[in-house]
Amino acid sequence: QNCCNGGCSSKWCKGHARCC
């Protein structure tokens, strides 16, 4: 799972802010 799937509140978003 990643930012794109978990949303901006996801811990994965930290390194993939562009997914938001």
Curated annotation (Swiss-Prot):
Changing Q1E: Decrease of affinity to Nav1.2/SCN2A and important decrease to Nav1.4/SCN4A with shift of selectivity in favor of Nav1.2/SCN2A. Its main location: secreted. The modification Cysteine amide is found at C20. Keywords: Amidation, Disulfide bond, Ion channel impairing toxin, Neurotoxin, Pyrrolidone carboxylic acid, Secreted, Toxin, Voltage-gated sodium channel impairing toxin. Expressed by the venom duct. GO terms for molecular function: sodium channel regulator activity; toxin activity. The keyword Disulfide bond applies. Belongs to the conotoxin M superfamily. This is Mu-conotoxin SIIIB. It comes from Conus striatus (Striated cone).
